[in-house]
């Protein structure tokens, strides 16, 4: 068990645009973390000019911009530059993390690791957990020094994440972390919640790119009165008790239970094999 003084400082990086309802669950996930307050931060970059997000908390920094980035890669680079830590968690605005997630990060992201994938994570579809399994590139953790070494995120839209991850893999230090299923901590939220770039395919010549498609979707919702504009005070909350859902799912499907918090478990269970 690591002492607080030995724990790494972790920066949770979140980029967002017009998805307050999802973002509030993401922020709440951060606030629930069982991790020293002086060892973590949440950086939120909002480039939806019609909204100014507000939330007063010493560990949460929100940057509201008056312009929209032309590529997601540029936005990711801007947000990464703001991160104080060398260990950076991708903290998507439409995903959820269990309270022991940063303890998992500290446990598995050792000094020789530059990029970490979760195998397993929690696959959440619609309004239910459907599997505890490999979740691809969702919730990756990477090292800022490695990000700098490869030149940052590529200046791309749809598909930028694959390019970035492939470059990090080539750089070295790839890890597939294998927490016990009962202690999986990153929820990949898929289906029935919001516009999801992963389901929209790659950009194609002559057609609107990912930024343009998402902007049009948000504008349509705004015109329907479904999106607030101006100053928006965030009210972090979870719509469901995701920890309880996870405990019930794991016990019913696998017959196991989470009997202790992650930071009480001293043995690392990791794999460097591609799932």
Which residue ranges define each predicted feature?
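N-proximal low-complexity "stem/linker" segments adjacent to membrane-targeting elements
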Residues: 1-29
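Cell-envelope/extracellular polymer assembly enzymes that use nucleotide-activated donors
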Residues: 8-11, 41, 163
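Short, acidic, metal-binding catalytic loop of nucleotide-sugar glycosyltransferases
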Residues: 28-39
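Glycine-rich, basic loop-to-helix element that forms the pyrophosphate-binding segment
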Residues: 66-83
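Conserved nucleotide-sugar donor-binding
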Residues: 84-86, 135-150
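Short beta-strand-to-loop acidic/aromatic patch adjacent to the donor-nucleotide binding site
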Residues: 85-94
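Conserved donor NDP-sugar-binding/catalytic core segment of glycosyltransferases
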Residues: 100-129
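Acidic donor-binding loop at a coil-to-helix junction in glycosyltransferase catalytic cores
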Residues: 157-164
